[in-house]
Every structure is written in structure tokens, then in C-alpha cells.
A protein has these predicted regions:
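A generic "cationic amphipathic patch" detector
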Residues: 84-86, 134, 168
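Catalytic cores of alpha/beta
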Residues: 52-58, 127-146
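Conserved SAM/AdoMet-binding glycine-rich loop
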Residues: 1-120, 125-128
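Auxiliary Fe-S-binding modules of radical SAM enzymes
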Residues: 30-34, 106-114, 136-139, 143-189
Length: 189
């Protein structure tokens, strides 16, 4: 959504430019040597803050990607304190808008019977300002997504370690990961 977007260097939320993205994807799809076409990450805040131009891009993704594609969204943490301390660029409200947007277009089944395009969600443990309540906020967000009937293709939970990051409670991290896998992944995925 940010490839050749307007204001990439100047704006907090650059305005997506569908034309160059469409050109790349339609061109790639026309290549007979290509069997599978997927993308990697998308910025949910860009989608949420620019719904109109994002619609055309999302339709192009759904039309050209192989079914089972994932558009990973890096929320990292649902905790506003962690968001602020680490200069994260997406908040839970923006994330929900972007997930709903991708669900609106991407849940259609492809040739292999899989949804064409679903969002993935990335969490990072060990960011500055994180507490046990941060994990609770992450779980609450996931519960909301499940309650709203929104689909995710996968949930990635990683931990960051090293200089500049805080130590994490291994017990809190394990409990969070276990709850996500048992209470969210199984019914949602």
C-alpha cells in the first residue's frame, strides 16, 4: 500500500497510489512461469487512514494473488503505553479497520478452496514499557476480533531481546502465547 505512495517521506500516513501496484501485480500474474504469487507485509495504519485508495489495491491483490495469501500486519502491541514508548505506527483501532477491510474483500474462496487474502497479525514481546497488562490488552483485542467474526490467517508472536529492550517475564510470555494458541488460534484459524 505504500509502494510509490504519495507523501512517503512527508506524511505520517502516505496516500496509497493504486496504479503502480496494479501494474506490478497484473504484470506478474501474466507471466506464464508464475504459479504462486503472494505478498508479505502491509501497513494497517495506511489502509485505515486511506480506505478509498486502499479499496482498489485490495481488489487487485484479491484478483491477482494465489489463494491462501497473507497480508501481515505489525501491530506489535495493543498497549497504548508500549505504542507510545516504541514509536509504533498502528493502534488497535486502525488495526481493526484494516482487518475488517481485508476480510470484506479477501474471504472469497480461490481455486484451491482457501480464502484469497486474509490478514496476519504480528505481536512482539519485550518492547519497552510492556507489563503483564500489555498481554491482557493483546488478548482482549484478539477476543474482540473473534467476537466480531473477523478472520485471521495466522498470528505471529515473537520476542525481541538485547540492548535497548527490556527483559520479559518468561512466565507471562509463555502464558500469553499458550492462551493465544489455545483460545484464539484453534477457534479463529
Amino acid at each position: 500500500y505504500t509502494y510509490r505512495a504519495e507523501g512517503v517521506r512527508e506524511l505520517e500516513y502516505p496516500i496509497p497510489n493504486p496504479e503502480p501496484i496494479n501494474k506490478v501485480l497484473y504484470g506478474a500474474r501474466e507471466d506464464d512461469r508464475l504459479d504462486i504469487l503472494h505478498v508479505d507485509n502491509g501497513n494497517p495504519s495506511i489502509i485505515a487512514e486511506n480506505i478509498e485508495p486502499s479499496i482498489e489495491i485490495t481488489k487487485c491483490l484479491v484478483e491477482n494473488l494465489s489463494d491462501g495469501a497473507v497480508l501481515s500486519f505489525g501491530l506489535e502491541s495493543a498497549d497504548p503505553h508500549v505504542h507510545e514508548m516504541n514509536w509504533l505506527n498502528c493502534d488497535p483501532g486502525q488495526l481493526k479497520i484494516a482487518i475488517k477491510h481485508i476480510n470484506d474483500f479477501g474471504r472469497v474462496k480461490g481455486e484451491r478452496g482457501l480464502p484469497k487474502l486474509l490478514p496476519g497479525l504480528n505481536f512482539i514481546a519485550g518492547l519497552n514499557g510492556e507489563t503483564k497488562k500489555s498481554y491482557d490488552m493483546n488478548l482482549s483485542l484478539l477476543d474482540d476480533l473473534r467476537s466480531e467474526g473477523l478472520w485471521l490467517r495466522r498470528i505471529n508472536i515473537r520476542q525481541v531481546e538485547g540492548q535497548g529492550f527490556q527483559k520479559i517475564s518468561k512466565n507471562d510470555f509463555r502464558n500469553f502465547k499458550k492462551k493465544v494458541r489455545e483460545e484464539i488460534d484453534k477457534p479463529l484459524l
